[in-house]
Amino acid sequence: MAVTLSLLLSGRVCAAVARCGFATRGVADPGPIGREPDPDSDWEPEERELQEVKSTLKRQKKAIRFQKIRRQMEASGAPPRTLTWEAMEQIRYLHEEFPESWSVPRLAEGFDVSTDVIRRVLKSKFLPTLEQKLKQDQKVLKKAGLAPLLQQLRGSGNTSKLLPAGHSVSGSLLMPGHEASSKDPNHSTALKVIESDTHRTNTPRRWKGRNKEIQDLEESFVPVAAPLGHPRELQKYSSDSESPRRTGNGALPSDQKLEELKAEEPGNFSSKVVQRGREFFDSNGNFLYRI
């Protein structure tokens, strides 16, 4: 009788505990100790979500700590600009028209800057005035040692030939190719190359030097009157030995040298000179010189 009463009371207590929600896995479903939890149970997904939230918070704290240390180590304010406004417009144009070909790393490599600078340029929507553009370009070119070039461009009123970056200075400027079609992959990254003014300023000097050399050469080819009295008669030399007998500056050999050559090759010389246009030949038809 006592055993039956105790069993009845224990059963009622277990039922009451189960109704109140305090039943445990061991009481409801007794089993061996150390068994792995059932993946189909109700509390497994909640624990999994809790772990994901904890890992996310940990990553966020780590990122915040890294940004804080970075701000402490770097200089305050925005970094100094190393690109001209023309280069910034090129970056925006290339990234907008050809985003696949000109990604952020590709632009950073092409303009010799960091990816943070490229992202700042793409994110910025600031529209400066002409004075602000010239002031910024002057700072960039002064840092690159090209301030005289900027003064020359400002004097001519042409600011479209400024160099793209202060670090890498080249003889040409890359401009977006408006004629390039985005349909053709071969021309998707076409660029128009404009020569720098530094090459053009050297061209007149080279031509001036060449013209002076030609003028001196023509003056050295004035015919010398021979003792026979003919205006076109002079002492001649063979055309085969013309180049080695000339002096270093392109003038004809001296009279003494001509006498020596005449003594060495007496049969090849003649006292008659025939002019054909600007070319002179001897009586045997051998070419002498050209004026």
UniProtKB/Swiss-Prot annotation:
Plays an essential role in mitochondrial ribosome biogenesis. As a component of a functional protein-RNA module, consisting of RCC1L, NGRN, RPUSD3, RPUSD4, TRUB2, FASTKD2 and 16S mitochondrial ribosomal RNA (16S mt-rRNA), controls 16S mt-rRNA abundance and is required for intra-mitochondrial translation of core subunits of the oxidative phosphorylation system. Residues 256-265 have a biased composition (Basic and acidic residues). InterPro entries: NGRN/Rrg9. Residues 1-15 form the signal peptide. Residues 27-49, 224-270 are annotated as: Disordered. GO terms for biological process: cell differentiation; mitochondrial ribosome assembly; positive regulation of mitochondrial translation. Forms a regulatory protein-RNA complex, consisting of RCC1L, NGRN, RPUSD3, RPUSD4, TRUB2, FASTKD2 and 16S mt-rRNA. Interacts with 16S mt-rRNA; this interaction is direct. The modification Phosphoserine is found at residue 41. Keywords: Developmental protein, Differentiation, Glycoprotein, Membrane, Mitochondrion, Nucleus, Phosphoprotein, Secreted, Signal. GO terms for cellular component: extracellular region; mitochondrial membrane; nucleus. It is found in: Nucleus; Secreted; Mitochondrion membrane. It comes from the Eukaryota. It holds the Pfam family Neugrin. Residues 39-49 have a biased composition (Acidic residues). Glycans are attached at residue 158. PANTHER family: NEUGRIN. Belongs to the neugrin family. This is Neugrin. It comes from Pongo abelii. The gene is NGRN.
